[in-house]
Amino acid sequence: MEKPQIELPVGPAPEDLVISDIIVGEGAEARPGGEVEVHYVGVDFETGEEFDSSWDRGQTSQFPLNGLIAGWQEGIPGMKVGGRRQLTIPPEAAYGPEGSGHPLSGRTLVFIIDLISA
């Protein structure tokens, strides 16, 4: 798959995690707390500015779900290898409220994630 273009949702930022399957995979299913390998791109909901992309680094990222932001811990399980999913994550499920010490705290984030292995 190629790097996706994110189409930002219209309207105000959601207060809860929004999960949207773009492509439903047919491979192994990601499990809560399991290890995953993904390609992803993330943008700021308000500005549309891209802040991170494994695609731009030219390599996938692999990590245990329990070490990630809550929005990923909740939004990736159930996804199947080969799938592409968009997560719209409010601050509370990302890096916390504004002033929490992370450059993205207080921001609603939008990610498109391709599940490579689970």
UniProtKB/Swiss-Prot annotation:
All residue ranges annotated as the PPIase FKBP-type domain in the record: 33-118
Function noted in UniProt: PPIases accelerate the folding of proteins.
UniProt similarity note: Belongs to the FKBP-type PPIase family.
Species for this entry: Corynebacterium glutamicum (strain ATCC 13032 / DSM 20300 / JCM 1318 / BCRC 11384 / CCUG 27702 / LMG 3730 / NBRC 12168 / NCIMB 10025 / NRRL B-2784 / 534)
Name of this chain's protein: Probable FK506-binding protein
Coiled-coil residue spans: none
This protein's record includes keyword Nuclease: no
Pfam families: FKBP_C
